[in-house]
C-alpha cells in the first residue's frame, strides 16, 4: 500500500485546526484526523480590532510538532485562511503596524469614496469583485491615510495564509485565490491592477505576482531535520471549501456555511455585466482557472455573537428549542452593515425588528429562530439572483463547512429555496486544502478527480424540500406580493 501524509492548517475567523490527512493510493481512500484545534477571535489593541497572529503561529507550530512527535513523515503542508486581511513587513521581514481585522471600523466611508472617485462600474469591470466595506483596497487606503508614518517602513504586504507560510519557510508568495478577495487584482490579467493599487495608496512593490494554487513555496524544517514542502493551496478558505464540494454537473450550486455564508456556482468565465454589478456578485478566483461566482452572506457570525453574549454552551439544546417555535415571526436582513460588528448583537437584532414593527425576539430560542429564518430567506433570494444571472435554475445545493451540521438550518434552506440540499463534508476547507496538496504530489489528476474521492469518503446527508412547511408558504406569499407590485407598477 502507498500512503501520503499531508497536513492542512485551516484558519477560520473563530477557530483554527491542524489536520492530518492520510491518502491511500490503491483504494483512493482519504481519512482525516484532528491533531490540534484552537480558538481564534478578535482582540482590541491600541484602538484597533486585531488578530493575534503570534498566538496563531504558535498554535500552528504546536500542531505540526505534534505530528512529527508521532513519528509520521509529512509529505506536504498547506495553509488556508479567511480573505482580505494582511500583514505588513519591513525589509528585514519584521512586522510593521498591527494585523488589523476586517471588522475594524477604520474603513468606514471609504468604499463610497472609491466609487465616487473611480466609478463603481470601472472598479467592478477591473476586479470583478463585490463591494464590501472591508475589502483590502479600503483597508490599505485607511492605513495610508490614517497611519502615513508607517509607509516608509513597509516593504511587503502578505495576506494571512501567505504570511504564515512565510513564517514557516522564509519564502514569500502571493496566492491567487486569496489575492482576488482584495479587490485589487485585475480580472483580465490575474495581476495587481495599477489603477486600483494607486487609489489604495499601496506601492506595487509590496506585492509579487499572484501564483495559482499548486506551487511549492518553500520548506519547513521539522524538529527531526526533515525538509517538508509547504504548498500554496487555494489559500482562501472558501476556495478550498469549493474544491471539496462534491458538485455534479452544471446545475449544482454551493453554500459554504460558517462564520460567513458564501453561496455561488463555478464558472469558466466571470460575470461582470450590469446585472451582476447590480446584484453585487463577486467573481473570486478558484482552482484550475475557474471562477467562484458567488455572494457573501453574513452567516453564522450573528449566532456566534448571540451565543457569546447570552453565555450559551449547549447549541443542540438551543436548536431543539428553536425548532419548536413558529417560522418567520421575526425576520431581519443579515447582510445589513449594522450586524458587521455591533457592540451588542442581541440588542441590534431586537432594534432591527422594532424598527420594522415586528414582534421583538427576547428569549435565546427566539433570537436563534430569527437568525435561522432570516438566513434561509436570504439564501432563497441569493439563489434566485444567481439563477437569473446565468439564465438557468439550479437542481441541487451543496452545503459544506461547519454550518452544515445544523440540520434545522439545512431543512429551512431546502424549504425556502425549494431545492434539494446535500449537506457535507463538514471539514470542506481542510479537504480542499489537502486536495491541492495531493495534486501537487501527483497523486490526483485534477479537481474533478478529487471530488470523486470526496463523494465516496465523506458523510453526506440529503434534505428534501417540503412545500407545505411554514417557511415555504412564507416565501410563496412574498413572491406573490412582489408579482402583484410589479404588475401594478
UniProtKB/Swiss-Prot annotation:
- Where ATP binds, per the record, is at 13-17, 259, 304, 402
One GO term in the molecular function aspect is: glycerol kinase activity
Its annotated pathway reads: Carbohydrate degradation; L-rhamnose degradation; glycerone phosphate from L-rhamnose: step 2/3
> Upper taxonomic classification of the species?
Bacteria, Pseudomonadati, Pseudomonadota, Gammaproteobacteria, Enterobacterales
Q: Which residues bind substrate?
A: 83, 236-238, 296
Q: What is its EC number?
A: 2.7.1.5
**Function in brief:** Involved in the catabolism of L-rhamnose (6-deoxy-L-mannose). Catalyzes the transfer of the gamma-phosphate group from ATP to the 1-hydroxyl group of L-rhamnulose to yield L-rhamnulose 1-phosphate.
Name one cellular component (GO) term: cytosol
Q: Which family does it belong to?
A: Belongs to the rhamnulokinase family.
One of the protein's GO biological processes: glycerol metabolic process
Indicate the quaternary assembly.
Monomer.
Q: Which cofactor does it need?
A: Mg(2+)
What are the disulphide bonds in this sequence?
A: 68-222, 353-370, 413-417
Give the active-site positions.
237 (proton acceptor)
Segments traversing the membrane? none
Ordered alphabetically, the record's keywords are: ATP-binding, Disulfide bond, Kinase, Magnesium, Nucleotide-binding, Rhamnose metabolism, Transferase
For this entry, the protein name equals: Rhamnulokinase
Swiss-Prot/TrEMBL catalytic activity? L-rhamnulose + ATP = L-rhamnulose 1-phosphate + ADP + H(+)
Q: Which InterPro entries match?
A: ATPase_NBD, FGGY_C, FGGY_N, Rhamnulokinase
Amino acid at each position: 500500500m502507498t500512503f501520503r501524509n499531508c497536513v492542512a492548517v485551516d484558519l477560520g475567523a473563530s477557530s483554527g485546526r491542524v489536520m492530518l490527512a492520510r491518502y491511500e493510493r490503491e483504494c483512493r481512500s482519504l481519512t482525516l484526523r484532528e491533531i490540534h484545534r484552537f480558538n481564534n477571535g478578535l482582540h482590541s489593541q491600541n484602538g484597533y480590532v486585531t488578530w493575534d497572529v503570534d498566538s496563531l503561529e504558535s498554535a500552528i507550530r504546536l500542531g505540526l510538532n505534534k505530528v512529527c512527535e508521532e513519528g509520521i513523515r509529512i509529505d506536504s503542508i498547506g495553509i488556508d485562511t479567511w480573505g482580505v486581511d494582511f500583514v505588513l513587513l519591513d525589509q528585514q521581514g519584521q512586522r510593521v503596524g498591527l494585523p488589523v481585522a476586517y471588522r475594524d471600523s477604520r474603513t468606514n466611508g471609504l468604499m463610497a469614496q472609491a466609487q465616487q472617485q473611480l466609478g463603481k462600474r470601472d472598479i467592478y469591470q477591473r476586479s470583478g469583485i463585490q463591494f464590501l466595506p472591508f475589502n483590502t483596497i479600503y483597508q490599505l487606503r485607511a492605513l495610508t491615510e490614517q497611519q502615513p508614518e508607517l509607509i516608509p517602513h513597509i516593504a511587503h504586504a502578505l495576506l494571512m495564509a501567505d504570511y504564515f507560510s512565510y513564517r514557516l519557510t522564509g519564502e514569500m508568495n502571493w496566492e491567487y485565490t486569496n489575492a482576488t478577495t482584495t479587490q485589487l487584482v485585475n480580472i483580465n490579467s490575474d495581476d495587481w491592477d495599477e489603477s486600483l493599487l494607486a487609489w489604495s495608496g499601496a506601492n506595487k512593490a509590496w506585492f509579487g505576482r499572484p501564483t495559482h494554487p499548486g506551487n511549492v513555496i518553500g520548506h519547513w524544517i521539522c524538529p527531526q531535520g526533515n525538509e517538508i514542502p509547504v504548498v500554496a493551496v487555494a489559500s482562501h478558505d472558501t476556495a478550498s471549501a469549493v474544491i471539496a464540494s462534491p458538485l455534479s454537473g452544471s446545475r449544482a450550486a454551493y453554500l459554504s456555511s460558517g462564520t460567513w455564508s458564501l453561496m455561488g456556482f463555478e464558472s469558466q468565465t466571470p460575470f461582470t455585466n450590469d446585472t451582476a454589478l447590480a446584484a453585487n456578485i463577486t467573481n473570486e478566483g478558484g482552482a484550475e482557472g475557474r471562477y467562484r461566482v458567488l455572494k457573501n452572506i453574513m452567516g453564522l457570525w450573528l449566532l456566534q455573537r448571540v451565543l457569546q453574549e447570552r453565555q450559551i454552551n449547549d447549541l443542540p439544546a438551543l436548536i431543539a428549542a428553536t425548532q419548536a417555535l413558529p417560522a418567520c415571526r421575526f425576520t431581519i436582513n443579515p447582510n445589513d452593515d449594522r450586524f458587521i460588528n455591533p457592540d451588542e448583537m442581541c440588542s441590534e437584532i431586537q432594534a432591527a425588528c422594532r424598527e420594522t414593527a415586528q414582534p421583538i425576539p427576547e428569549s435565546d430560542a427566539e433570537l436563534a429562530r430569527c437568525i435561522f429564518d432570516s438566513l434561509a430567506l436570504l439564501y432563497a433570494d441569493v439563489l434566485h439572483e444567481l439563477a437569473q444571472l446565468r439564465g438557468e435554475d439550479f437542481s441541487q445545493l451543496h452545503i459544506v463547512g461547519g454550518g452544515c451540521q445544523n440540520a434545522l438550518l439545512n431543512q429551512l434552506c431546502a424549504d425556502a429555496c425549494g431545492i434539494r440540499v446535500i449537506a457535507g463534508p463538514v471539514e470542506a476547507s481542510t479537504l480542499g486544502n489537502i486536495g491541492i496538496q495531493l495534486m501537487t504530489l501527483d497523486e490526483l489528476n485534477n479537481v474533478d478527480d478529487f471530488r470523486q474521492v470526496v463523494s465516496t469518503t465523506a458523510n453526506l446527508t440529503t434534505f428534501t424540500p417540503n412545500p407545505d412547511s411554514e417557511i415555504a408558504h412564507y416565501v410563496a406569499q412574498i413572491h406573490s406580493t412582489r408579482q402583484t407590485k410589479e404588475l401594478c407598477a
